[in-house]
A protein has these predicted regions:
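Fe-S-dependent hydro-lyases/dehydratases of central metabolism
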Residues: 1-665
Length: 665
């Protein structure tokens, strides 16, 4: 319990050990003492803390399912809640993946007060701080906790920026913001003198909020500065809107109103096709009705608050999916260069392809931003990637990201919380959709976000897509200053990047595709090929699927009888594009199972999910953490490899199909 400014742990410590038998013994009542030689589980994702189906709940019920998705299946319902644990200990990269606040919330609800890990991912850490869950990477605390010592709260604020430290000391973000609005506390003034800044730093400086909660901007900011920044765009989807609404009303009053609702958006995109794949056991648990309630609650919130809801659509009188995945629609309809965009999803960073600063937040951050219009952040360091040359035929941006993610800088955790800025003539030679793949997957590196300076290609896109005036778009463009400081800079020769595949379990498990047979001891046969999601359901992705499948049809080939190939559109605009290009006919003739716009299989909520642990999927989505798209194994690859593998029945590149498609030889 917390007594004044100190914590005394009365409950047990749970070590999430790599040895499943040792973990089972702890769950059965054995007390394990701290031993630095015992291997702990690394890369525990938020999907493992609270699998997608657990997120249909957003109350104390979450306590019953804490860590139920942990690899190996050792932890069962109620095990954490009923185990008397107050401390959970794990290895590196705790809380990677999704921005879902249900993950730390389930820990708190189950009685956990302290999380200790070798390293902790940025969004998970901020969500935990917001709800009063104490975090540390200092393993020397464990013997002290086991001895029953009082641990000063300062041990959990050491190294934090002043705002984060104050939030932790306050017990969470709502308590801090109530004090801030009442004038009882103030964030530190931003007093950094003029200096050369990166794109991200410039956008943050322009959106900085003064101590009086007005958006006056700052002369300059530098990495480490703590501040609140005014958000131009705030959005959420049905997975998070209900939880954010419950927190919003509890924190600010049942009749509280969202400030500037015209800049707030809601999306029905994640669970549109859940009924098609919900396991019988989940139906029997009542989860169908629970999941359906998320959509109806979001509709109620949107109506009551006057915010724009991107909902479901019909075609010829029949259901036709969602208007679009939030990230695709934010690029198509909403975000602009130079803006600050927050969303209730870790892949909000995809909009950075337009030259805006876009990043994911949890439900508590979002609920507070609905009221205050601002979001707290610590100015992140920036890593620069200078892309030179051109990609070889048959290689695309997905391969670039899988190549980058497997590098030591990211695998070691040194990139956690960094901005990934992509630049160089190789970057600007890529079309918007391919740039969006780069920024989308920045979070897979543990990054804060990804960003690319807007250029004439972006100006032309926004003029054509939205009818904006070119001069107005150009006036919004933000560029890094000469002499801006980067914590690291990497030069990438695009011509040297080769087709990649990420082995199951983590998008950072990338290897060159040519090594897959040796790595796996033979061909990797597949049951499912999935092309969709915000990452793999864009217009350029449709071009790639169609190029491979069209060439296959010309050779008299179709999707292998042993494989189901799903192609799912990221939005109705993308579906219309595919139809106008004649791709729908190509897909149907090739044996593709077409799926209307929605997140679908990426979130284990639509056609394309695996149904058993022995099924193997090759997928164009962005992450393959255990359980993410079903119980089977998921390999990540480019749209080209996904389509070719569906034809071959095993993971291959299009050049391995005989004869190879035109332009890929």
């Amino acid at each position: 319990m917390v007594e004044g400014n100190a914590l005394r742990v009365k409950g047990r410590v749970l070590y999430l050990t790599a040895d499943s038998k040792l973990l089972t013994r702890q769950l059965s009542g054995e007390t394990l003492k701290f031993d630095p030689s015992i291997a702990l589980i690394d890369n525990i994702s938020t999907d493992e803390l609270t699998p997608g189906w657990v997120c249909y709940y957003y109350d104390e019920t979450l306590a019953r399912y804490c860590l139920i998705g942990l690899r190996g299946g050792t932890i069962q319902k109620d095990a954490i809640r009923d185990g008397g644990f107050e401390v959970v200990v794990s290895g590196a990269s705790k809380g990677c993946g999704s921005s879902r606040e249900t993950a730390p919330y389930s820990e708190v609800a189950a009685g956990i007060r302290v999380v200790i890990a070798r390293s902790i991912e940025k969004i998970y850490a901020q969500n935990a701080q917001n709800i009063g869950l104490l975090l540390s990477t200092d393993f020397s605390l464990l013997p002290r906790i086991e001895r029953g010592e009082e641990i000063p709260i300062e041990e959990f604020t050491r190294g934090l920026d002043p705002i984060s430290a104050a939030i932790v000391a306050s017990g969470g973000l709502f308590a801090y913001n109530r004090a801030r609005m009442a004038g009882r506390v103030s964030p530190p003034p931003t007093e950094t003198p003029a200096r050369p800044m990166t794109i991200a730093e410039k956008i943050i400086a322009r959106h900085a909020v003064s101590q009086g909660m007005s958006a006056h901007g700052a002369m300059a900011v530098a990495p480490g500065d703590a501040l609140f920044a005014r958000a131009d765009v705030r959005f959420s989807h049905e997975y998070v809107t209900p939880m954010a609404d419950a927190l919003f009303r509890a924190g600010f009053g049942q009749d509280a109103k969202i400030a500037e609702p015209e800049s707030v958006y809601a999306f029905r995109d994640h669970l549109t096709f859940l009924d098609l794949v919900m396991p019988k056991a989940h139906v029997e648990m009542g989860l169908r009705d629970q999941a359906a309630s998320l959509a109806t609650t979001q509709e109620r919130v949107a109506t009551a608050q006057g915010i724009r809801l991107y909902g479901e659509v019909t075609r010829d009188g029949k259901p036709a999916g969602s208007e679009g995945i939030c990230h695709n629609k934010v690029i198509e309809d909403i975000a602009l260069p130079g803006q600050l965009v927050i969303g209730s999803d870790s892949h909000t960073c995809m909009a950075g392809a337009l030259g805006c600063l876009a990043f994911g937040v949890g439900a508590t951050d979002l609920a507070n931003a609905w009221f205050t219009r601002d979001v707290r952040l610590k100015v992140p360091e920036t890593v620069r990637f200078v892309l030179a040359g051109r990609l070889a035929p048959g290689v695309c941006a997905k391969d670039v990201m899988l190549h980058l993610l497997c590098q030591p800088f990211w695998r070691s955790g040194r990139g956690i919380g960094k901005v990934l800025e992509f630049t160089g003539e190789g970057t600007f030679a890529l079309p918007l959709d391919e740039r969006a793949t780069l920024t989308n997957m920045a979070v897979e590196a543990g990054g804060f976000t990804g960003i690319i300076e807007a250029d004439e290609a972006i100006v032309s896109y926004l003029v054509a897509q939205r009818g904006l005036a070119a001069a107005d778009v150009r006036a919004r463009i933000v560029k890094s200053d000469p002499g801006a400081a980067y914590v690291e800079s990497f030069d990438i020769d695009l011509a040297a990047v080769e087709p990649m595949v990420a082995l199951p379990g983590d998008p950072r498990n990338g290897i060159p595709l040519r090594q897959l047979r040796d790595e796996s001891g033979g061909d990797v046969r597949i049951d499912i090929a999935y092309g969709g999601s915000c990452t793999g359901g864009k217009k350029s992705d449709m071009d790639m699927y169609a190029s491979v499948l069209g060439a296959a049809l010309a050779r008299g080939q179709r999707v292998s009888p042993s494989v189901k190939l799903y192609v799912q559109f990221g939005s109705q605009d993308i579906r219309k594009y595919a139809e106008e290009k004649g791709y729908l006919d190509t897909f149907e003739k090739a044996g593709v199972l077409l799926v209307e716009p929605s997140c679908g299989a990426c979130i284990r909520a639509g056609p394309g999910v695996s149904l058993g642990p022995d099924e193997v999927t090759v997928s164009a989505i962005n992450r393959n953490f255990p359980g993410r798209s079903g119980p089977g194994k998921v390999y990540l690859a480019s749209p080209l490899v996904v389509a070719a593998s569906a034809i071959a029945g095993k993971i291959v590149h299009p050049v391995d199909l005989e004869p190879s498609p035109p332009g890929l030889r």
